[in-house]
C-alpha cells in the first residue's frame, strides 16, 4: 500500500466508519492520504480510479461478480468485515425477510472467506 502514498485518493465522507478504517490503513502503512475526492458513491470511486484520477480502498463486493477493470492490490493482514441481518423473532419467517436474506447470501458468496 505504500506505493499509493504519492497518489490522490478518493474516500467516503469524513465521519463514516469506512473513511476512518481507510485512513487507519494508510497510517499503518506509514502515510497520510491526500484525499482529493470525497463521496459515499462507490461507483464514483471506481470511475475515478478507472480514469486514473485517484486510488481507493474498495470492498470486493463492488465488482458484483464482474472482472475488475483496474489493478487490485491485496492488503496485508487479510482485512474483512462481517455483514449480518436482524429481525424481530415474529418477522423472521416472513417471505420478504427470507428473500432478502437469501439474496444477500447469494450476492456475498463470491467474496466470502
Q: Residue spans of the language-model regions?
A:
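Residue-level recognition of oxygen-bearing side chains
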Residues: 17, 41-44
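Primarily hydrophobic membrane-targeting regions of prokaryotic envelope proteins
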Residues: 26, 37, 46-47, 103
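Short beta-strand-to-loop elements that line the ligand-binding cleft
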Residues: 11-12, 32-41
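Secondary-structure junction motif
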Residues: 1, 7-29, 93-101, 108-113
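Short aromatic/hydrophobic contact patches that present stacked aromatics
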Residues: 8-10, 36, 84-86
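Beta-alpha-beta core module
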Residues: 3, 43-92
Amino acid at each position: 500500500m505504500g506505493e499509493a502514498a504519492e497518489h490522490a485518493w478518493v474516500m467516503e465522507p469524513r465521519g463514516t466508519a469506512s473513511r476512518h478504517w481507510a485512513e487507519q490503513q494508510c497510517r499503518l502503512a506509514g502515510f497520510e492520504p491526500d484525499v482529493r475526492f470525497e463521496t459515499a458513491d462507490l461507483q464514483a470511486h471506481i470511475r475515478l480510479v478507472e480514469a486514473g484520477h485517484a486510488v481507493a480502498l474498495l470492498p470486493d463486493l463492488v465488482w458484483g461478480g464482474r472482472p475488475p477493470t483496474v489493478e487490485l492490490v491485496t492488503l496485508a493482514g487479510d482485512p474483512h468485515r462481517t455483514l449480518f441481518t436482524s429481525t424481530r423473532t415474529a418477522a423472521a419467517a416472513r417471505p420478504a425477510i427470507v428473500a432478502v436474506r437469501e439474496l444477500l447470501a447469494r450476492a456475498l458468496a463470491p467474496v466470502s472467506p
